[in-house]
Swiss-Prot record:
Belongs to the cytochrome b family. The chain crosses the membrane at residues 33-53, 77-98, 113-133, 178-198, 226-246, 288-308, 320-340, 347-367. Heme 1 (or BL or b562) is low-potential and absorbs at about 562 nm, and heme 2 (or BH or b566) is high-potential and absorbs at about 566 nm. Heme b b562 binds at residues 83, 182. GO terms for molecular function: metal ion binding; ubiquinol-cytochrome-c reductase activity. It is a multi-pass membrane protein. Heme b b566 binds at residues 97, 196. It comes from Myoprocta pratti (Green acouchi). This is Cytochrome b.
Length: 379
């Protein structure tokens, strides 16, 4: 078996990626999220496939088909809620994965980091389109509001919006194409994940110390496969607890009302995992400015390798930078809360202050702190 594992052209690739992969001996549980995201992606593709077998992408029957899945299909309710809450799980894991990358300076592996940003954008696009498919009130109005943002693009904006809609409003054509994109994007994500891993295995993994670990590596299997299984159990337990006890905890009650173009919901808001970006979008009174801030809130991640001015890679031994990162985390929690609140005083002001401090922390305070720490350490 060993011979085949190391000689067979296809099995050899799997062997070098998951079995004999030289891995730093000191990586912590923070390095489990990559494998958890892989499992989550597989689960989303499988549950999505089974949902697609019963779903109809037509404005007149989409809502009813989702109801039919929940009521009449064997374990349809389970598949539907696993898929919906699996998306929430996916984003929790992604945000933790990115947070770990920032804390331990993994963004210095710039190719892996940039592919990761592309992955984040692809996952966000997929989740947004998936939210439109049940054709509830929030699906319809969410699609209308978010696609309408493109009209802020000078000159070509309005034409672009109508082109995406496939008409003069969000309708059957929009739903059909969103379903098509929602189906194809996960497979593009799988290809990007493979590229992400390819670049990662070119350089080798980072580790909590931020130092070169070439002199102290161990095989991935059995040490980290066992460790990953523990992560799978934790994730599986959390997800099942959510699905079986409170499946609608993270959803919006408005989405249990069929889409009605003549009736606007009192508060249009996206799913919880987009609320921080939505709060940044809303905190700028100008439409184009808001759209640019929305994009910047995600694309600012691409600047991390450039803004890294510290002589140390990791934040493990940099207490001031460490505090700043936790302040940034708290700031994101505040933005998430504000994104779900109505546009009125004092929420508008809190949102604007949180948006300013978000960009200020990343673009100004973190690089300055890095330079200051270098001075303290006489580097």
């Amino acid at each position: 078996m060993t011979h085949l594992r190391k000689s067979h052209p296809l099995i050899k690739i799997i062997n070098h990626s998951f079995i004999d992969l030289p891995t730093p001996s000191n990586i912590s549980a923070w390095w489990n999220f990559g494998s958890l995201l892989g499992i989550c992606l597989m689960m989303q593709i499988l549950t999505g496939l089974f949902l697609a077998m019963h779903y109809t992408a037509d404005t007149t029957t989409a809502f009813s088909s989702v109801t039919h899945i929940c009521r009449d299909v064997n374990y349809g309710w389970l598949i539907r809620y696993l898929h919906a809450n699996g998306a929430s799980m996916f984003f929790i894991l992604i945000y933790l994965h990115i947070g770990r990358g920032i804390y331990y300076g993994s963004y210095t592996l710039s190719e892996t980091w940039n592919i990761g940003i592309l992955l984040l954008l692809a996952v966000m696009a997929t989740a947004f389109m998936g939210y439109v498919l049940p054709w509830g009130q929030m699906s319809f109005w969410g699609a209308t509001v978010i696609t309408n943002l493109l009209s802020a693009i000078p000159y070509i904006g309005p034409t672009l919006v109508e082109w995406i809609w496939g008409g003069f409003s969000v309708d059957k054509a929009t739903l059909t194409r969103f379903f098509a994109f929602h189906f194809i994007l996960p497979f593009i994500i799988v290809a990007l994940v493979m590229t992400h891993l390819l670049f990662l295995h070119e350089t080798g993994s980072n580790n909590p110390s931020g130092l070169n670990s070439d002199s102290d590596k161990i095989p991935f299997h059995p040490y980290y496969t066992i460790k990953d299984i523990m992560g799978f159990m934790f994730m599986g337990f959390t997800l099942l607890f959510l699905v079986l006890f409170s499946p609608d905890l993270l959803g919006d009650p408005d989405n249990y009302t069929p889409a009605n173009p003549l009736n606007t919901p009192p508060h249009i808001k996206p799913e919880w995992y987009f609320l921080f970006a939505y709060a940044i979008l809303r905190s700028i009174p100008n439409k184009l400015g808001g759209v640019m801030a929305l994009l910047a809130s995600i694309l600012v991640l691409a600047l991390f390798p450039i803004l890294h001015l510290s002589k140390q890679r990791s934040m493990t031994f940099r207490p001031i930078s460490d505090c700043l990162l936790w302040m940034l985390t708290a700031n994101l929690v505040v933005l998430t809360w504000i994104g779900g609140q109505p546009v009125e005083h004092p929420y508008i002001l809190i949102g604007q202050l949180a948006s300013i401090s978000y960009f200020l922390t990343i673009l100004v305070l973190m690089p300055l702190t890095s330079m200051m720490e270098n001075k303290f350490l006489k580097w």
